[in-house]
Amino acid sequence: MTIFQFPQDFMWGTATAAYQIEGAYQEDGRGLSIWDTFAHTPGKVFNGDNGNVACDSYHRYEEDIRLMKELGIRTYRFSVSWPRIFPNGDGEVNQEGLDYYHRVVDLLNDNGIEPFCTLYHWDLPQALQDAGGWGNRRTIQAFVQFAETMFREFHGKIQHWLTFNEPWCIAFLSNMLGVHAPGLTNLQTAIDVGHHLLVAHGLSVRRFRELGTSGQIGIAPNVSWAVPYSTSEEDKAACARTISLHSDWFLQPIYQGSYPQFLVDWFAEQGATVPIQDGDMDIIGEPIDMIGINYYSMSVNRFNPEAGFLQSEEINMGLPVTDIGWPVESRGLYEVLHYLQKYGNIDIYITENGACINDEVVNGKVQDDRRISYMQQHLVQVHRTIHDGLHVKGYMAWSLLDNFEWAEGYNMRFGMIHVDFRTQVRTPKESYYWYRNVVSNNWLETRR
């Protein structure tokens, strides 16, 4: 038996996102988002599922916070529905939307759970998408207005802020690969979107400082780790592109003032350029306090000229996989956290990490041993990095609840709490009770 003791101030938590859990998509003045439009379009989401009701957390947040309290977590990462605050993207504020988040944040604080707020987790107001979305620089100022409104409203109530969740998904998965809303397939648009959201990030950080908002602010990329299939230079380069597009494309401009040149050149060969205007890089480089890291898996990659715009193909090496098909390899988390040290020994929070395991309720229980094993393996790697001297400050398990898993609909379950989407009955899984013990003890026990 081995005990892995965590620092006394380590922030144990869990995470969700607004569109995935709230539901109430037409209630109390909320406008439509690109995910409403996308999910309501036949063929875009598995089984025609949508987030109209989701986990109904808009009406059941008190029950969900009670379950968090019983879990013993110190922090809860949630996101704000932009169209719930600004139904048209900008202009007039919807007070009922603000009131809802005040109720949530106040109840979290009353229960000793620190709110960890993500401003943008993919639900762009449809009205802005109709005008070009993140491909239009107008959206930058609309986002800053939204961010400033949140900073003013929740100053003193929220101490941890993230501007954007997984910018790679916002830019490339959604606008180049077309898998997520708005479902576009244009490389230049994807690069425009990525740059504009970084400018919006920088301007929001600047406004955060100008307003004297309490707490810390950062951004949460979904990082990737890949190892080459062979020792060939082509395979090594394919891996470098995979890693760098997820991590460096969005962090290097913030920390070093430039995009990775080898990727700039790679995209230029495909006819796409970064739309940098005067002053953009200074804005993007506004100092941040921390970063959130979302990590799920690593891959083995090789060069394949037919494998998409990166020409990097993932190879099945026979590793165990979760039910969504992602290989389980916790070493990648350790490697990528060390890789990011080139930007300095910055404060890092693991803002998402978890496994899709589709176990069902049997005799009132969900015995999700594979999820427990996954979390245990990854927490060992988190402990290793802390022991190495890295400033990893917290871990937020994805997710509190089974929820609407984007293009997979309700077909894939990541929660530590099972949700029956017909009845909305919540059933804590064995992973919930296992994690509760880890949080309570502040240490992890493994058998070797």
Curated annotation (Swiss-Prot):
Catalytic-site annotation from UniProt: 166 (proton donor), 352 (nucleophile)
Enzyme Commission code: 3.2.1.21
Gene3D superfamilies to which the protein is assigned, alphabetical: Glycosidases
MF-aspect GO terms: beta-glucosidase activity
Xref: InterPro entries: Glyco_hydro_1 (IPR001360), Glyco_hydro_1_AS (IPR018120), Glyco_hydro_1_beta-glucosidase (IPR017736), Glyco_hydro_1_N_CS (IPR033132), Glycoside_hydrolase_SF (IPR017853)
GO cellular component annotations of the record: cytosol
Keywords assigned by UniProt, alphabetized: Carbohydrate metabolism, Cellulose degradation, Glycosidase, Hydrolase, Polysaccharide degradation
Subunit structure and binding partners: Homooctamer.
Function: BglA is intracellular and cleaves cellobiose probably through inorganic phosphate mediated hydrolysis.
Protein name: Beta-glucosidase A
